[in-house]
Amino acid sequence: MIGNLDNDSMIADLGCGCGSQPIQLALHCQAKVKALALFPLFIDKLMDRCLKSGVADKVEGIVGDMCSLPFDKESLDVIWSEGAIYNIGFKRGITEWREYLKSGGFLVVSESSWLTDTRPEEIEQFWNEAYPEIDTIANKVQQLSDAGYQDIRTFVLSSECWIENFYLPQKDAQRLFLERYPDNKTAAELVAIQRHEAKLYSRYSDYYGYVFYVARLS
């Protein structure tokens, strides 16, 4: 989907956390990667993983805010944001970030989206409260087009991907979290919310999911 990247190309991964996506980008693309996260601890962990993976020379960890990017205008060949654009909002992100892309540069983001035009009231109410910007794929594509992007492509992540990479690892994290904060009401409420969300996904995964949007700036 994205071609013509070379050793001088630059990819910015916004909201990278300490995850694996900057490493995978560095391994599979010739371009260099600027990985941005809000917390220094995330960047420290990421760069340690990059060193162990042999890509520390291709990845630059940056502590920064996706609401105020520390990049020059029209300096990036690709903006990548996996499961993070919701922090700023889809419409705001695709609009504000475009000025950092070179002409013909690519935007690649994943976003929670409705997979159907209608859905049960329980899951619609949950998501409209949790993330009011959730919308159908068709409407998200239209928003990208209205913001000046073209050649828009989409693909839906499988439910197995969401379960195996998010909800299952979350179970171990929840257990450790509750062991660390026993008899803590706030901790218990947080875990209860997460477990409720997981149950909703197991019940309603046909109606929503994570969708990748790949678009080229006009």
Regions found by a protein language model. Give the residues of each.
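Conserved alpha-helix/loop element of class I SAM-dependent methyltransferases that forms part
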Residues: M1-N7
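A short SAM/SAH-binding and catalytic strip from SAM-dependent methyltransferases
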Residues: V78-K91
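Short, glycine-/aromatic-enriched active-site segment of Class I SAM-dependent methyltransferases
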Residues: S112-Y131
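Class I SAM-dependent methyltransferase SAM/SAH-binding core
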Residues: A12, C18-S68
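Conserved Class I S-adenosyl-L-methionine
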Residues: R153-S218
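A short acidic, Gly/Pro-enriched loop at the edge of an enzyme's catalytic core
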Residues: C67-V78
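Short alpha-helix
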Residues: E133-G148
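A short glycine-rich, Lys/Arg-flanked "PGG" loop and its adjoining helix->strand segment in the class I
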Residues: R92-F106
